[in-house]
Amino acid sequence: MSGNEFKAKAYLKEGCPFSFKFLVFMSEAGLLDRIEIVRMKPHDPGFEAEKDKLAKHLGKAVTFPVVEVEPGQYQTDSDRLIERYAAEAGLTPDAQPVLSFYKQTIFPQLIELFQIKHPKTAKST
């Protein structure tokens, strides 16, 4: 990568099943070199300030993961992000066995727990 080439920045919230789903796909697809991972730790002092910055870029409340896909262009929604990177790489998300396993077994259980803990912020993507 040349010095001026843009590298997407992925803001992944620790403990977030949606962030983990995106990370599972990117890892399994061999695409981790396309993103810079920013670990968002809810208990870190700068978490809320960084989240507020992301909200300003998005123009709405933040849901994770958030990826700066192009300079100044931010996208959320794990499924849309997976579809985007899969299409760019000529891959089919459902053909990824680890991602499929996660989505069919572990992910639904995590969503159930997430909805109990965060009833107002839970989503289904």
Predicted regions and their residues:
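Local sequence-structure signature of Cys/Sec-based thiol-disulfide redox active-site neighborhoods
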Residues: 1-39, 43
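Thiol/selenol-based redox catalytic cores and closely related redox-interacting motifs
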Residues: 42-125
